[in-house]
Amino acid sequence: MFFHLQQQQDNAFAQTATTVINNNNTAANITLGNPQIIYTEYGKTTNMIPFVVNGTHGSRLSFIGNGTIQGINVTDNGRAISISKADGSIFSRGVGILTANASSRGIAAFSFIGTGHYGTDGKLRDFGPIYFLNATGNLASLKGAAGIYKDQINKAGNAVTKLWLWKQ
């Protein structure tokens, strides 16, 4: 069995080695667009439950926040898992829902991944990608958008989050 897999791998490498990459100018036309800060949120961690799994420390948490995105006042509700890494960094993954506070209510569901560190002032500063999976109503323009967020969370759980958004 191992010999057969090794032979397939060798064949794949042999085929790959003969592939020629044509470097044309089409890549030069790719841009990142003009990302802008479109959202600032003021939030708070509402619940934090520490856990340890196989010696790895982390927390399950929930959060709420308020902000304005594309001129629409929204409330954010979400949850995340944060894991402490051996190098002192923090890895987070979570989901949330922005809900418009307007008469033509809309929602925008998102997921995010982040990494960060605690500063000497005790504040967690982290950043990462955010993906809007679905959106309706007056937030429908966010559907399929991706962005980068950056936030700062103090010891009391108060957070400020900024979002740069890309949409094709």
Feature map (PLM): residue ranges:
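Beta-strand-enriched cores of mature, soluble protein domains
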Residues: F2-Q168
